[in-house]
Amino acid sequence: IPLRFQVTEFDCGTVSLLNAFSYLFEREEIPALLVKSIFKYTLDCYDDKGNLGQGGTSREAIKKLTKWITNYTSENNFNVKCTRLEKEQVTLEKMKECINNNGVVFIRCYQECEHYVIITKITKNYVYIFDPYYLERNEYDNDNSVKMILNKPFDYNRRVTIERVFSETKKDFSLGSVYSR
């Protein structure tokens, strides 16, 4: 099935996690308990008015969910491995290794604020991302580092330079400072 877009301003983490599993598995292979747990752990942050979920998904929630998935896969017949990387552990080589082993990379990057997306392909110069935030086709016309891809709904919808992804800026799709990764 095609990968999905966010239904709110805040559910990029939830949707990107669901997209990661949708990319890796057929619908009938995805356990309902996994989907339920993604919804349980994500959207755990409050906005400045105290509204739960409207602050998105925290790093701590992703850490806990990674642990839950690891435990679940060790106790059940579900073949997936989650490895959580931080700071200087986040390297292009590790991302390529994941992709080359038929995996998906779930990252927290920037898009005006912290934002979650998945990487499904890496080439010599580019990272191919599925961004769950729907944008108009001309959004990146003035940004040479990002290209909208509209004809790959099962795989990706952005092509981003590797240089941009690993820049220590807060430009769209940058991972930002090494120490905040």
Where are these regions (language model features)?
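Noncatalytic regulatory segments and standalone regulatory/sensor domains
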Residues: I99-N101, K121-R181
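Cysteine-nucleophile protease catalytic domains, especially the papain-like/related folds used
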Residues: I1-L85
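Generic alpha-helical hydrophobic packing signal
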Residues: P31-V35, I119, N151
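A generic structural signal for ordered secondary structure
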Residues: L65-T73, Y116, R137-E139, D143, ...
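Alpha-helix N-cap/loop-to-helix boundary motif
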Residues: G50-T57, K87, Q111, V160, ...
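Short Gly/Pro-enriched loop/turn and capping motifs at secondary-structure junctions
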Residues: P31-V35, E114, Y134-E136
